[in-house]
A protein has these predicted regions:
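N-terminal binding-site loop/beta-alpha segment at the start of enzyme catalytic domains
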Residues: 1-98, 107
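Residue-level detector of conserved catalytic or cofactor/ligand-binding positions
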Residues: 115-122
Length: 122
């Protein structure tokens, strides 16, 4: 599926300068800055540019990536590209990341474009 690549080695000091705040009473800590995938992770952005954005964010302690099912452009493409980036470069760092998404955008016409099945399928 993917061509062999060098293993991504993030900045070992990535947590030293970022401020982290507790999310309510959950105990979850989130960085003061998150990376939103709205416009820069769709079909029109070169994959190397997406990779550079994510590497720079993570190297600076940004551990929260924000997505939605309509982010692109083309709707849904940002989630797909995030999945590719996670699988290819962040497999060994997945436990350090918080990935959030939202649902509410109808992905296609018909009764299943915003169904529970669509929202919950991997």
């Amino acid at each position: 599926m993917f061509e062999p690549t060098a293993i991504y080695a993030p900045n070992p000091h990535r947590y030293d300068t970022m401020t982290y705040n507790r999310a309510g009473t959950s105990g979850l800590k989130l960085p003061a800055v998150s990376l939103g995938f709205w416009h820069n992770f769709g079909d029109i952005t070169p994959f190397d540019q997406m990779k550079s954005l994510v590497f720079t964010a993570f190297d600076n302690g940004i551990t929260h990536f924000d997505l939605a099912n309509n982010y692109g452009p083309e709707p849904g493409q940002a989630e797909k590209n995030c999945g590719l980036l996670l699988a290819k470069y962040f497999r060994h760092h997945r436990d350090e990341l918080v990935i959030s998404t939202k649902a509410g955008y109808e992905m296609w016409a018909g009764p299943y474009g915003l169904s529970l099945i669509h929202i919950s399928e991997p």
